[in-house]
Amino acid sequence: MTLNNCASMKLEVHFQCKQDDDSEEEEQCTISSHWAFEQESKCGSLMGSSALLAPPSPSLLGTSSCESVLTELSAASLPAISASLSPESADQPLLGLVPSPSNQPFLSPPQGQEGSQDKVKKHYSRSFLKHLESLRRKEKGDSRQTEPEQCLATSEKATKASSFRTCRGFLSAGFHRAKNRVTTSARVRDGETQKAWEAWPVATFRHPQPIRRRDYLVHVPGDHKPGTFPRSLSIESLCPDEGRHLADWQSSRCWGYEGRRGSCGSTGSHASTYDNLPELYPAEPIQAEAEAEAEEGEGSYAHLDDILEHVWGLQQRVELWSQTMYPDLRPGDKEEEEEEEEEEEEATSSVEVATVEVEGQDEDLAQAESQAHRGFPTQVKEEVPLIVLDQAPNVVEPLVQAEAEAPAQAQDLEQEANSTAEPISASSLSVEEGHSISDTAVSSSELDSSGNSMNEADAADAPAGLQASVPRERRDSGVGASLTRPCRKLRWHSFQNSHRPSLNSESLEINRQFAGQINLLHKGSLLRLTGFMEKYTVPHKQAWVWSMPKFMKRNKTPDYRGHHVFGVPPLIHVQRTGQPLPQSIQQAMRYLRSQCLDQVGIFRKSGVKSRIQSLRQMNENSPDNVCYEGQSAYDVADLLKQYFRDLPEPIFTSKLTTTFLQIYQLLPKEQWLAAAQAATLLLPDENREVLQTLLYFLSDIASAEENQMTAGNLAVCLAPSIFHLNVSKKDSSSPRIKSKRSLVGRPGPRDLSENMAATQGLSHMISDCKKLFQVPQDMVVQLCGSYSAAELSPPGPALAELRQAQAAGVSLSLYMEESVQELLRDAAERFKGWTNVPGPQHTELACRKAPDGHPLRMWKASTEVAAPPAVVLHRVLRERALWDEDLLRAQVLEALMPGVELYHYVTDSMAPHPCRDFVVLRMWRSDLPRGGCLLVSQSLDPEQPVPESGVRALMLTSQYLMEPCGLGRSRLTHICRADLRGRSPDWYNKVFGHLCAMEVAKIRDSFPTLQAAGPETKL
C-alpha cells in the first residue's frame, strides 16, 4: 500500500438516513475477505493471497493508494461508479485510461498470464505479511502506538444512512467538490450526521511521478467488531521524510489550506484525499506517457486487471441496492446540489475594494496566498474532468461550475477569514464580512412561510478554522489612530439578504424613496390616519388628540455624555456612530439569531439577574465590542428587553405610542395594516429603522418552531417593554406616564385594554413586518404627479453625454468647473453666510440653505490634519478604506482624462437595511496657490443597473478643500449635500451634518499625531 508521503488519513463513517422501523439488524460493511481483525494488536491483517500487493514501480505507485479502499468494500456499501469523459468513450470504462503496458483494454482479462499471476500474488502476499510483522514489532519496541480517536455515536438508523453516503465519498473522492456552506444553528442536530459526506474536497490530479516507497500503519478503533467496516480508520506514515516538500505528493488544491475548514464536516479530523491517481485528461498524453514507460513498467499492472474487473462488477449490484434501500436519498442530494448552486451564484457578490494604484491585484493576492500556505501546489493550474454517479446526471454542470470557481472561492474565503468590519490596507483593499459567502446563500428550502431565512453564516456557526478571536486582527494602514481604532461596524449580510424585498415590492420600500417623496408621504399619512381616527373613535371621547408643546416651559436637555448604550435614544446613537442601534445590541441580536433559535421559551423564561447585570456593565464599558459566546440565551434576551424598556421614550415615540395603541383598540382588523403603515411613516427615521430591525429579528425568532415562541407569544413577553406599559414615574423618565392604579394594586380597565391592544398590535406587526414598511400603492396613485416630481435625478451629465463630448474634443473638466469655482469663491470669502451649529469635538460644523431651493441643506465640516495637503488629497482620493468604516466596495470605473475619473463605491448600512451605492464623476486639482488641493465630485447616470440589495444614492455636491496651515499641517474642509434615500428632510437637519463632521474627523485620525518626546532643548 502506498499513500501520500507523511499522510495521516482518518475516515469516519456516520449514519444518517431513515429506514423502515422493521429494519433493525445492523448493516454489515466488511472490509474484504482478505482481511482479519486481531484483538491483541487492534490492527487488521491480510489472509491468503491478495491482488492489492504490487511492486512499487514508478508508474504503479501513482495509482495504487486508493484501490486498497476502493476495491475491497462490500457490495452493500458502495454506490455505482460511472464515467463519461467523451462521447467517443461513453462505453469505455474510466479506468481504461490508466497507462497500461499493452494496447489492450485495461479491464480485459490478461491472456496467458494466469499461472504467472498466481505466483506473483503469493510472493507479494508473503512479503507483505512479513513486512507487517516487522512493523508491528518495531511499533511495540518504540512504544509509539497512537490511540484511535473516538467518533460521535449516532443512532442505528442514522448510522446506516451515513454508510451509504460515506462510501459514496470513497468512490468520488477527488471528484466531488466539498460543500463550503455552514449549517444553521437551527439545523445543527439534523446536520451532524451529514458531516462525513460533506467532508470530501475536490482533488487535483497530476501525472504519476516516481515516489519513494513508504511504510504505513493502519489503526483500527478499539471498539471495532471483527468482520465489519471500522467507523474510524487512521493510516499514518511510519518513516516520514523530513526533507521532502509537501508539493511532491499530489495534493488537492485545498489540502493543507488552514484558512478553510468549512468543507470539513468535523473540525477534529482530516478527510483522506486519494490523489495518487493519474491525471484524467484526454487519452493522448497519457497513452504517450504509457508508451514511454511501457518497457520500464512491463508487468506492473498485470495483477490489477482482476481487481478492476471486480470493482467494475460491483456497479450493477450497488445501483440496485441503493435504489431499493435508500429511495429517499436522491431528493436530498438534489436539494444539496441546488443549495450549492445558489451559494456559488451569490458568492460573486462578496465585497471587494479595488483602486487604480493596485495593478495585478489578483495575481499578487494569489502569490501571497500560495506562499502563506505550505503544501499548496501553486504549479497546478489545470482543471480535470469530474467523475459523477450514473444516478445523478443532473449535478454534472453544478459540479463542473464549482470546480471552475474553486480557486476564486478559496481566495474569497481566505480574505473573509482574516477580515472584519474594519478597513484594511491599500495593498489588499478588500473589506468583507467574516461569512459573506455563506451569508448570501439563502435557499428556498430554508425560507419559512413568511419568506424569512433562518440560514445563518455567522462567526459562531463557522468552523474553527474560520473563527477569529475577539477582537480580530486588523488589516489597516498600521499608522496613526488606525492601530487603536476599535472594530466598530458589524457586518451582518445574512440578515440583510434573508429580508431582501422581492422585485415587485422593491420600489415600494420606504428606504428607497427620495427625501422629497418622504416629505409628501408624511403629509398623506397624516391625512389618512386622521380620517381613520375620526371615523372609528367615539365622538364624546378625546381619542385623537396630540398635546401642544408648552412654549413657556424650558425643557432641560438631557446629558448623555456618560452613557453609551442603555438610556440613550436612537437619535444620539446615529449622531455618534451613524447607526441608530448600539453595536453591542446588534451583536446580541445576531448571537440570538445565529445560535439560540432552538432555545425553548426564549424571551419568556427569565435569566439570572446577576449575569444580566454583568452583561449590562460589559455593554457600557465596551459598547463597540462585546462577546456573547457562552452566555445564556435567556440572559441575552432579557438584556434586549431591558434595553428597549430603558429608552427615554418608547420606540414608537411618546407622541405616537397612544396612536398605535388606539389603532388596535378602535379600528376593525381589516384596517390595521393601512393605519399601521400610515403611523409608521410618521415615525422619526431613526426610530423607524430600529423598529424595522427589531420586527424582522422577532419574525426570525417566531419562524423557528423549536423555541415554541410564535408571534403572539413574543408579543405577550415583549409588548410591555417596547410600549412602556405599566411604567411609573419613578421607574422611568419617559414623558408617557401611566395613570394611577386602584388602591388594591390591580390594573384598571384602561390598563387592561392597552395591554391587550399592545399585544395584538405587536403580534400583527411581527407577522406583517414586510408589508408594514412599504408605501401604500393607493397613496402613490393619489399623490400622482407631485410624487413623481419629487424624484431626484443625478445633477451631473449622463455618461453617454460625456463620451460624446470627449469624442468631440471638449474638455471634461468644464462639467465640474462650476463646482470648483464655487468652492474657491467661498474659501476666498471665508465661507461667509454659513450658520455655525454644535458638532463633534475638535471639528467645526456649519450649514446653509441650498441656492436651488431644495429642502436638503448644505453642510460644511472643517478640522486640522497633521499632514500636508497633497498627502491628505491622496488619502481622500485613493485610500478611502483607511478611514471609511462603512465601505464595502470601491473602484475606479474609468479614467476619462488626467484629473477626471468615474468612481464607484458602496457603503454598508445597519442590517437589514440595504447598502448605499454611489457612482460619481470626480475631478481634483493640486496646483492651487500656496500648495493647496481640492477634490469635487457629483453623481451621474452610469447607465448600469443598481446592484442587488442595494440602493442608488445621489451625491448632489461633494467638495474637499485642503489648505496649508503650518509646517506639515493642513486645514481640511468638506462641503456635502446628498440624498441617501429613505430619510426625511428632518433627518438630514438633525443627523447628516454630524455624519459629515465624523467623516473629516476619521480622515484626521487616520494620520499619526506627532508628539514631542523629552524636554525642550535650549539653544
UniProtKB/Swiss-Prot annotation:
Keywords: Cell junction, GTPase activation, Methylation, Phosphoprotein. Residues 134-147 have a biased composition (Basic and acidic residues). One of its GO terms (molecular function) is GTPase activator activity. One of its GO terms (cellular component) is focal adhesion. The modification Phosphoserine is found at S108, S234, S237, S494, S502. The record marks R604 as: Arginine finger. Transmembrane segments: none annotated. Its main location: other. It comes from the Eukaryota. It holds the Pfam family RhoGAP. Residues 569-773 form the Rho-GAP domain. Residues 92-122, 134-154, 325-355, 406-482, 731-754 are annotated as: Disordered. InterPro entries: Rho_GTPase_activation_prot (IPR008936), RhoGAP_dom (IPR000198), START-like_dom_sf (IPR023393), START_lipid-bd_dom (IPR002913). Residues 805-1013 form the START domain. One of its GO terms (biological process) is signal transduction. It is found in: Cell junction, Focal adhesion. The modification Asymmetric dimethylarginine is found at R168. Residues 100-115, 418-430, 437-455 have a biased composition (Polar residues). PANTHER family: RHO-TYPE GTPASE ACTIVATING PROTEIN (PTHR12659), STAR-RELATED LIPID TRANSFER PROTEIN 8 (PTHR12659:SF3). Accelerates GTPase activity of RHOA and CDC42, but not RAC1. Stimulates the hydrolysis of phosphatidylinositol 4,5-bisphosphate by PLCD1. Binds both the SH2 and PTB domains of TNS1. This is StAR-related lipid transfer protein 8. It comes from Mus musculus. The gene is Stard8.
